[in-house]
A protein has these predicted regions:
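Short aromatic/hydrophobic "clamp" motif used to bind/position activated sugar donors
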Residues: 116
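Histidine-anchored nucleotide/phosphate-binding helix
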Residues: 28-43
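Short loop->beta transition adjacent to catalytic acidic/histidine clusters or analogous donor-positioning motifs
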Residues: 42-51, 78
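Short internal beta-strands
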Residues: 48-56, 144
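Conserved donor-nucleotide/metal-binding helix-loop-beta segment in metal-dependent transferases, i.e.
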Residues: 123-156
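A glycosyltransferase accessory/donor-loop signature
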Residues: 1-17, 21-23, 33, 170-294
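Active-site-proximal specificity loops/subdomain of glycosyltransferases
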Residues: 62, 70-108
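Catalytic metal- and UDP-sugar-binding loop of GT-A-like glycosyltransferases, i.e.
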Residues: 119
Length: 294
């Protein structure tokens, strides 16, 4: 581990949280804003260990840009891990790159870490993640939030999870040789409709559990989806609880077409609040332009 400043040195008196992102060059600015929101929202006694799994062509200037977070925040460190070519033959398209599959290798890439939060780069965090990090897996290996797409509703019901925010039991992933299982599936050459998300839900359903809605709020919500979530977990519907979880979540995910380039979606100003906090932010510069092309 490279020590960037004295307050990036771990201490036994702090609560540790392990978080991974898998950005490429195009998504660096989104990752910067996501990490900034995490560091702005964490408690003083929380130390964040970030693991950025990057492709071999990740630009040095993008590493330096992310390292500039040390100038603004404290009690965290960032470890860059360059991925090899193991996912070169995974199914991709113009929108989804092979980095989408990197999360499946976190158990092997982080051999000394037993659990980890995985986050897509299109999220912001409002609160300390300690409670999320310490959720009970209840015998499951991967926790996520139900995927509510219309096609999922019609074909699968609601027992599928979105892979943009995951809590991973890396110890169990290693014990179950999860990465090897994934690689065998990828080698078969199947074209997954929703890429990593289809792969995980189609082949590993027995490993999957769900976490509360406060850890995966979206820019929109509706009564039907909330009620079906309660049907899944077998508890009475509580509209006040869901309203609070959506209005005041721990994590918000700008998934699908609801991205920072779209100023007409709910809560997008929250994202730009963290973007503007950076001393590198300039609305007329190219520093944050890639956020619009995502």
């Amino acid at each position: 581990m490279i020590i960037k400043n004295i307050k990036s040195i771990p201490s036994p008196n702090l609560n540790y949280i392990h978080i991974s992102f898998c950005p490429n060059n195009e998504y660096t600015n989104l990752a910067y804003v996501s990490i900034s929101s995490i560091l702005s929202s964490k408690s003083l006694n929380t130390f964040i260990c970030f693991y950025l799994i990057i492709p071999s062509d990740f630009d040095k200037k993008n590493k330096n840009f992310l390292d500039s977070l040390y100038e603004e925040y404290e009690y965290f460190n960032i470890t860059f891990i360059t991925m090899d070519k193991r996912y070169n033959n995974s199914y991709t398209d113009h929108r989804i790159t092979e980095q989408a599959y990197y999360r499946f290798s976190l158990g092997e890439l982080l051999p000394n870490v037993n659990k980890c939060i995985y986050l897509d780069t299109d999220i912001i965090v409002y609160k300390d993640l300690y409670n999320f990090f310490n959720l009970n897996f209840n015998g499951r290996m991967i926790l996520g939030y139900p995927s509510y797409g219309n096609q999922n509703r019609q074909k699968y019901g609601f027992h599928r999870i979105n892979t943009g925010i995951l809590l991973l039991n890396l110890f169990e992933m290693r014990r179950n040789h999860f990465e090897k299982q994934v690689m065998k599936i990828i080698k078969k050459g199947r074209k997954f409709q929703y890429h990593d998300q289809t792969l995980l839900n189609d082949y590993f359903k027995k490993y999957l559990g769900i976490f509360p809605p406060e850890y995966h709020a979206r820019p929109w919500s509706n009564y039907t989806e909330m009620k079906i979530f309660n049907n899944i977990i077998g508890k009475p519907f509580d509209s006040d609880y869901f309203y609070f979880s959506h209005k005041y979540p721990t994590i918000r995910h700008f998934l699908g077409n609801y991205k920072p380039r779209n100023f007409n979606i709910n809560y997008i100003e929250d994202w730009w609040f963290y973007a503007r906090k950076s001393k590198y932010y300039n609305s007329k510069s190219t520093t944050f332009q890639s956020a619009f092309s995502f």
